[in-house]
Amino acid sequence: AGSRVLWPQKLSYYDLRLMRLTEGEAAFNSEMQNQPIDPAACLFSEQWFRYFNPAEIDFRAARFRFYGYCDPSLGRSASSDYSAIITLALDTDSGVAYVWDADIQRRHPDRIIADILEKERLLRRETGRGYTLFGAETNQFQWFLKEQLARESAKQGLYLPIQGVRSTEDKGLRVESLQPDVKNGYILFRPDQTLLLHQLSQFPLGAHDDGPDALEGARTLSRRGVRGAPLTGLRL
């Protein structure tokens, strides 16, 4: 009672209430009521972010392995339907992971699949090799995207090495596990990866967290890949 929507033609009172429930009060207050998020309440400080210049690194070197991960965000509300495709370049000599690509945008499942396969082609053109492993979430009905990705990959002759991932641990705990990697410079970013950095700096209070979720997935895949291979010199 007593509530008045300033622009009812854009969002109804019901829409706003639903958004507040699905996105959380802190994210809603920041996005819709212009109440800024307190950085002290977030898990990642912008001062922790360390950067690299792609022009200064030879990603064609044999020591690099590439790990990808997709958070498709299928079935979520229309206001939070970003999908994230993160590609990490792991330097197996130093153990440092470079965020080679951070693609976070709104798109339909068919476009997600097409973009993943295009990144495989781009890796092969620019580095001489494709993904060592690519993780795709299979929670709930997201499994169908992984299956379709495999079929389309084979159809196009790419044969992407796909690993289905069913997440059972709380997302907040998973993303929080990135803290020491980011803080200690074990994960390096490009300065132009602004949306990923923004989502990290606002986690867990921001409206969107698809980028951090996919980053954690790629990081975890890379660690498992290293443990399963006869590599030396990894410092974590």
Question: Which stretches of residues belong to each language-model region?
Answer:
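ATPase catalytic-site recognition across NTP-hydrolyzing enzymes
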Residues: A1-P72
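Mg2+-dependent endonuclease catalytic cores in nucleic-acid-processing enzymes, primarily RNase H-like
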Residues: A1-Q9, Y14-L18, Q35, P39-L43, ...
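Flexible internal linker/loop segments at domain or repeat junctions
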Residues: I57-A62, L90-V96
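Generic detector of well-ordered alpha-helical packing
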Residues: P72, T138, D210-G211
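Acidic two-metal-ion nuclease catalytic site recognized across multiple nuclease folds
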Residues: A218-L236
